[in-house]
Amino acid sequence: MKKSVVRRVLKYIKPYKGLLALAILSAIISVSLTLYIPVLTGNAIDNIIDKGNVNFENVLQIIIYIAVGVAGVAIFQWTMTYFTNVISYKTVRDLRRDVFCKFNDVPLSYIDTHSHGDLISRVINDVDAVGDGLSQMFLQLFSGIVTILGTMVFMFIIDWRIALAVIILTPLSLFVAAFIGKMTHNRFARQQQLQGDISSYVEEYVGNQRIVKAFSYEDRAFENFEKYNQELYTVGFKAQFAGALANPSTRFVNAMVYAAVGIFGAITAIAGTLSVGQLSCFLTYANQYTKPFNEVTGVLTQLQTAIAAAGRVFDVLDAENEPEDKPDSIKVENCKGNVKIENVNFSYVKDKPLITNFSLDVKSGSHIAIVGPTGCGKTTFINLLMRFYDTDSGKISVDGVDIKDMERDELRKLYGMVLQDSWLFCGTIMENLKYGNPNATDEEVIEAAKAAYAHSFIRRMPDGYDTMISESGGNLSQGQKQLLCIARAMLSNPTMLILDEATSSIDTLTEIRVQKAFAKIMQGRTSFVVAHRLSTIKESDVILVMRDGNIIEQGTHDELLAKGGFYKNLYESQFAK
C-alpha cells in the first residue's frame, strides 16, 4: 500500500524532472562545498600546530577559501530549497486539480454516499499534508544522498578502516526508523480519517446553526464534537508519540558511532597514523555522514502523515467514474419534449427496489405533476430523467432517443431545474443568474428576474444586481433565494422544466406570483413538477400519484378527486377545515 502510494505521487513529480535536475545539481554543489570545507579546516589546523610554527599566509588564504565556500553553500542551498518548493507546490496544484475534476466524473451516488466535509478535507487538508511531506522529503533526500556518498569518499581517502566501521554501524539507525515507521503507519492513517470526520461534523454544525439554536442543541452538539475531538487527540497523540521515538533513537545510535570514531581516531592520531587536522576533518565527516540519517527520522512523522493523506486522496481518484457516453452519441436537434418511460426499475440498494415497472408517455408541452408521500420515489424519478442515476432496467427516451444514447451534458441542457434546496454560490446576483446561460445579456437577465418576480427585491439590494451573495445565500431569505433560482431557470430557456418542491418555502402572495410566472414559462414546454403542496399543481395536465415507487393513480385534479382514492385523501388532509 505504502509503496504504491509513493509510486503514484512520484508520477505527479515526473513532469517537473527539469526542475528536479536543477534541484539535484544545486544539492551536489552545495554538499560538495560543505564537504570540502572540513579539508580546508584541517589544513588550517595543521598550518597552525605543525612544528610549532604558524604559517599566517597559508592560514589567511585558507580562511578566504572557507568564506567563499560558505557563501557558495548558502547560495546553492537556497536554490535547492527554491526548486524543491516549486516542485512541491506544482505537484500539490496538479493533485488538487485532479481531485476537484474527479468530482465531475464520479456518479452522483458517490457524492450522496460520502460525507461532504470529509471530501472537502481530502481536497484541502490531505493534499496540503502531501505537499508538506514532499517539501521535507526533497530537502532531506537530495542533500542527504549526496552528503552520504561524498562523506564516504572523503572518509575512505583519509582512513579506510575507520570509514568502513562508520559505514557498517550507522545504518543500524535505519532499521530502528523502519521498525517505528511500520508500527505507526496505521495510526497516522486513522488520524487523517478522523480529521476528515471532524471536518464533516463542523461543516454540518456551522451550516445548520439555525436548527441547532432553534432546538437548543448546542450542549449536545458540543458533546458529540468533544467525542470526535477527544478521539482525534488520543489517536494523534499516540501517532506523534510513537513517531517521535524515531529521531532520538537514531540519534543515540549515531552518537555512539561518533564516540567510537573519536576514540579510535584519537588512538591512531597518537600512533602517528593521522594528523590532528586529519582527525578533526574525519570527525566532521563522520558527523555529516550520520546527519542525513538523523534528519530523515526527524521528519518521519510528517512523511507518515503525508503517505496516509495521499492514500485518502488516491481513494477519491480511484473511485469509479460515471459510465462514459457512447462514442456515437445521438444529439436531439430541435427537441420537442416528448418523454417516454417504459418498464423502468430502479433501486439505490440491491434487493431493495424503489421504482418497479414504471411506465409513462408524456407528450410535448404536457405539464406533469408528481405527488405522493415522502420516500415514494418522486425525487428519484427526477434523478432518472436527468441521468443523475441510471435505471436498473427499462428505458427512458426523449423524442424517441434513448437517453443512454445521448451525451449527459446534451440531455441535461434540455432541462431547466429548480431544486428543493436553493443553491447559490459566492458571487454577485448577476453572476448567479447567468450560471446556466453565461452568454445572456444584462437585459435578458433583468427580464428573467422580472418574470420571476425577483426584480423588485433585487433593486432594493445595496448594489442591485451587483450585490454580492454570501456563502449559500446567507444574506437572502429562503423565498428570495428560490426566486433567484427560478429566474436562473427561466434565463436558460430550456425545452423542458423540472420543478422539485420549488415553491415550498415561499409565502402565499409570492407563490401566487411565481405560479403566474411559471404558467408563462411552461407554455409549450414539457414540465415535471414535484410538490407536496397540492394547491400548486391543480392546473397540471396529468397528475401522477406515486406510492412505493409505483404510479397508483393518474389523471387531472378533478378526475382524481372524483375517484375518491389516495389523491383525494392527500388533498383533503391538506385542506381539511
Regions from the language model: what does each represent?
Residues 2, 20-76, 157-161, 272-276:
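Transmembrane helix-loop-helix hairpins at lipid-water interfaces of multipass membrane proteins
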Residues 4-5, 13, 45, 80, ...:
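Juxtamembrane loop-to-helix connectors within ABC transporter transmembrane domains
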Residues 15, 108-109, 125-134, 138, ...:
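An intracellular "coupling" helix at the cytosolic face of ABC transporter transmembrane type-1 domains
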Residues 25, 76, 80, 88, ...:
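Hydrophobic alpha-helical transmembrane segments of ABC transporter permease domains
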Residues 52-58, 154-168, 238-311, 316-317:
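Helix-loop-helix
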Residues 89, 97-121, 125-127, 200-224, ...:
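Short intracellular "coupling" helices and adjacent cytoplasmic loop segments at the cytosolic face
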Residues 325, 332-577:
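ABC-type nucleotide-binding domain
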